[in-house]
Design a protein with these regions (language model features):
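FabD-like malonyl-/acyl-CoA
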Residues: 22-190
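Helix-enriched interaction subdomains in cytosolic or periplasmic regions
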Residues: 1-15
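Gly/Ser-centered flexible loop/linker motifs
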Residues: 184-203
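Short amphipathic alpha-helices in soluble, non-transmembrane regions
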Residues: 4-7, 188-191, 215
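Conserved alpha/beta-hydrolase "nucleophile elbow" surrounding the catalytic nucleophile
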Residues: 132-134, 200, 211
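Helix N-cap motif at beta-to-alpha junctions
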Residues: 1-3, 181, 210-215
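Short beta-strand segments
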Residues: 37-39, 178, 198-201, 209
Length: 215
């Protein structure tokens, strides 16, 4: 733990190419319960997980696991998530587009989560509860002991591949609407085919999906 603390302090001095969206504290732990929240597809970005992978061997183990996994090894998730630096915005856009594809994004997000969980576990931080949004539910189930890391990678790879296959060459889109399902249903009937009620997130938000033109 002391070695990890020293590495964290040392990392604060280095120049980071990406803005950090987290805060690390070495103070005494707070009282109360801890929840881990796992994000879904759409949270991916080029460079995700690179800082941890470069600084901590334990974090790299998750990427090594993915590289040797029968379902994700051929994808080379490490090269997709933190590829060589792009020369210009065109190259960066191409890298982003490749990572955004469902068959890549979902297992890559899983690898990042496994990387983070391994490091947090060694630091002694345990979750009392976990929740996930959409794809993140898979990693929450992994943390809860429902499936091991290899199974989580398998589910992530298969889920992403099946969703990509179902979408085909159709360019889809999603639209969040601040209303309830019963209000939006008659609107969809008037609009006609092409739009469906994909998510009923709650009494004040639904998500519609369909082809970009329909949305």
């Amino acid at each position: 733990t002391e070695s990890l603390s020293q590495q964290i302090r040392a990392g604060e001095i280095g120049v980071r190419p990406f803005k950090a969206d987290c805060v690390a504290s070495l103070d005494a732990p707070l009282t109360g319960k801890t929840a881990f929240m796992f994000s879904g597809q759409g949270s991916q970005y080029v460079g995700m997980g690179s800082d941890l992978a470069m600084a901590f061997p334990l974090a790299r183990e998750a990427w090594d696991r993915a590289a040797g996994h029968k379902h994700t090894g051929r994808l080379r998730l490490d090269r997709l998530s933190f590829p060589p630096a792009a020369f210009d915005q065109v190259d960066f856009g191409a890298q982003t587009q490749t990572l955004t594809e469902m068959q890549h994004a979902q297992p890559a997000i899983a690898a990042v989560a496994l990387s983070q969980l391994g490091l947090l576990s060694q630091l002694g931080l345990k979750a009392d509860m976990a929740a996930g949004h959409s794809f993140g539910e898979i990693m929450a189930l992994h943390l809860g002991g429902v499936m091991n890391a290899d199974t989580a990678l398998t589910v992530a790879a298969e889920r992403g591949a099946l969703m990509a296959k179902a979408a085909g060459n159709t360019k889809g889109a999603m639209l969040a609407v601040q209303t309830d399902a019963e209000t939006i249903k008659p609107v969809l009937q008037k609009v006609g085919q092409g739009l469906v009620l994909a998510n009923d997130n709650g009494p004040d938000q639904v998500v519609l999906s369909g082809a970009q033109e329909a949305v």
